[in-house]
Amino acid sequence: MTDNKYLTVTDLNYYITQKFKNDPYLHKVFLQGELSNFRYRRNSHQYFSLKDEKSKINVVMFRSYFDKVKFKPEEGMKVYVVGYVSVYGPQGSYQFYAENMEPAGLGALYEQLKQLQAKLAKEGLFNPEHKRKLPRFPDKIAVVTSASGAVIHDIMVTANRRFPHAEIDLFPAQVQGDTAADSLVKAMRQIAAQGDEYDVMIIGRGGGSLEDLWSFNEEEVVRQVYAMPMPVISSVGHETDTTLCDLVADARAATPTAAAEYATPNLADELAGIHQLQSRLIAGMQNNINQKRDRLNRIKNSVIMREPTRLYDQQIQQVDLLKQRLQNSIQNKVNNSLQNYRLLKQRLLSVSPDKQIAGMEQQEKFLAKQLNDNMKHYLKNKRSDFSKIVQQLDDYSPLKTLERGFVYTTNEEGETVSSVDQIKKDDHLNLHFKDGEVTATVTEVKK
């Protein structure tokens, strides 16, 4: 007998697994049943069973899928699950692999919630850029919750313990039931009507089922939270519960106590921080003073301080150098200016009227001298000529003639008589000799 016709257990399980995978009806199965053997495992995969009146099937829900479940599963709870069927090879058993789980009977609510969430998300109500920063030191805090629940008590106790300065004002509202949404909106509008009276608002309630928390998923409540003029902290249900108020609020707290902690600083921590900063500031200042003192001592003990004049040696030398440069520069400028002045003066003199006048004066003097010399020469010549003429005249002068013994005669009128025709008898005539005159009377005229 040969072994070839016998399958191994692994081969058989693999074959059956492939049958399950290739069956289109088992790829995505919608299953309803009652939770059985459910034991919550924190941060782990969940293993339980689903059963009805006649049958039971083992279920595995991996952590990545279970973290998305929006309610708290409990033993005996009827649920809707979606997943696929496959074989677990090591044990040779088939089981259901759940990918989604909802409480039975709440599917319509979940669908409504998803649709509203998608609508508001599309409008941008949940966008991070709309989230406002919580004030660090609030003066007044408004709280919207039930007046009779533990929420307001936890908030006031925590806030008074952490930051007694803050004033807590309750705006009571119904947090469950058909009229809860209207009551919540009315309370928030009362707060908004007071403008900037409040620094922050807390809205919340304790845990409950999806139906119990449904008023915090109503559209008018969510929009009013978004429209509040101050930052809003939402604390609705337990940590596993998430409402649309949580998504639209500026901050979400898992518990009322956590909400109060978000809203207020811890005064003791702040004082401790102040004291720490004060100590660091004093230490820093003291360290700075010590450093400055050490530096001052080093400066006081330096050679420069012991011989202060050395502090200015380089500066004095630099001043001397600059002074010499300045003097040289001034001298050069003066020399250049003088040279330019001389050149300009020479050029001016070359075209100056004074020089021309001086030349003309010089020429005048020369011409005057030449004229004077010429005049003297001319006069000398004329004197010589005059002397000759005088000599000639003197030679021909009547006086000379008189000296030779001749006389000349004038009548009584002083006219010279040169002819006997000018004389009559009894005329009185003056006879001029070289040394005198003689008056004579004509007694006779002869020719």
Swiss-Prot record:
A Pfam family reported for this protein in Swiss-Prot or TrEMBL: Exonuc_VII_L
Transmembrane residue ranges: none
Keyword flag Membrane: no
Domain of life: Bacteria
Catalytic reaction(s) noted: Exonucleolytic cleavage in either 5'- to 3'- or 3'- to 5'-direction to yield nucleoside 5'-phosphates
Family annotation (InterPro entries): Exonuc_VII_L, Exonuc_VII_lsu_C, OB-fold_nuc-bd_dom
Keyword tRNA processing annotated: no
GO molecular-function terms, A-Z: exodeoxyribonuclease VII activity; nucleic acid binding
GO biological process: DNA catabolic process
Recorded GO CC terms: cytoplasm; exodeoxyribonuclease VII complex
Keywords: Cytoplasm, Exonuclease, Hydrolase, Nuclease
Subcellular location(s) per record: Cytoplasm
EC assignment: 3.1.11.6
Subunit relationships: Heterooligomer composed of large and small subunits.
Family: Belongs to the XseA family.
Stated role: Bidirectionally degrades single-stranded DNA into large acid-insoluble oligonucleotides, which are then degraded further into small acid-soluble oligonucleotides.
NCBIfam families membership: xseA (TIGR00237)
Protein name in the entry: Exodeoxyribonuclease 7 large subunit
Taxonomy of the source species: Bacteria, Bacillati, Bacillota, Bacilli, Lactobacillales
